[in-house]
């Protein structure tokens, strides 16, 4: 899994005002990998938690692996560095360990005030979704004319300038990843492809493809999700395996990914869950356990992003 810690804390959908304490709790529990994104609008809180623990002497910056993501409205080459610097300013960091292209799809660029301002107090944060999700009269996203291969060139420049140590992608299908890897003049391969992955969407083919190309896989939503009525925590197979190992269902779901050589980034703001989710290195699932969990696959994707389905680079029109 390269230099990426096997388990990280995701700040996706984390309740505003509670992220800083969650990050501090996570560092105390042993987390060193933190995953965030401009689109989550909580980079500032993540950074505050990190700075507090560094100031305490609990951890050093070089011990941490901090990842964030380029949003779709900033795929134009001239906007990539601006977007990265805005994230660094929000986090109050000098560099990122990993910067990801959040989706392969480029959207209409943001308001000029966003581009001109490197302050998080700009128009875009007063009306974040207006800027982040430009919609047409049919409530479908307005695309840009960008190509993610051009965006990648600007991402590579960030490595050269030292703003980021590694670059990667998220939500890319195998054809898109292959196109990127075959790009003439490629200077840096993506370190990882961050994808939705859980027992109802095992992503066997995409994981195999990525790993065969020496691109690691990072699993988001590893516990599924209860809001869509898909609660893996209550799945009887998962509960039975958890009982057999004396572990929680969440720990089984996280360990499942680790044994596939997949990096995993569960999210939580609850101290007990944060601690529990990283206590997954003192047991192993049997091959029988792994096979039973893999058999739960339904190819059920939760993060469909339907307002983008007409985009030329929508990633989910093919099987993987």
From Swiss-Prot:
Pfam families according to UniProt: Aldo_ket_red
Residues involved in substrate binding: 102
Keyword annotations: Cytoplasm, NADP, Oxidoreductase
Keyword Zinc: no
Site (Lowers pKa of active site Tyr): 69
Gene3D superfamilies per the UniProt record, alphabetical: NADP-dependent oxidoreductase domain
Main subcellular location: cytoplasm
UniProt note on tissues of expression: Specifically expressed in testis. Expressed in testicular germ cells and testis interstitial cells.
Cited InterPro entries: AKR (IPR020471), AKR1E2 (IPR044484), Aldo/ket_reductase_CS (IPR018170), NADP_OxRdtase_dom (IPR023210), NADP_OxRdtase_dom_sf (IPR036812)
Record-annotated active site: 40 (proton donor)
Activity regulation text: Inhibited by p-chloromercuribenzoic acid and alkyliodines.
Binding site residues for NADP(+): 35, 194, 265-277
One annotated GO molecular function: oxidoreductase activity
Enzyme Commission number: 1.1.1.263
A single cellular component GO annotation: cytosol
Catalytic reactions on record: 1,5-anhydro-D-glucitol + NADP(+) = 1,5-anhydro-D-fructose + NADPH + H(+)
Highest taxon in the source lineage: Eukaryota
Protein's cellular compartments: Cytoplasm
Broad class of enzyme this protein falls into: oxidoreductase
Function text: Catalyzes the NADPH-dependent reduction of 1,5-anhydro-D-fructose (AF) to 1,5-anhydro-D-glucitol. Has low NADPH-dependent reductase activity towards 9,10-phenanthrenequinone (in vitro).
Family, per entry: Belongs to the aldo/keto reductase family.
PANTHER family, per the entry: ALDO/KETO REDUCTASE (PTHR11732)
Self-association state and partner proteins as the record states: Monomer.
Record-given protein name: 1,5-anhydro-D-fructose reductase
Species the sequence originates in: Homo sapiens
Organism lineage string: Eukaryota, Metazoa, Chordata, Craniata, Vertebrata
Gene: AKR1E2
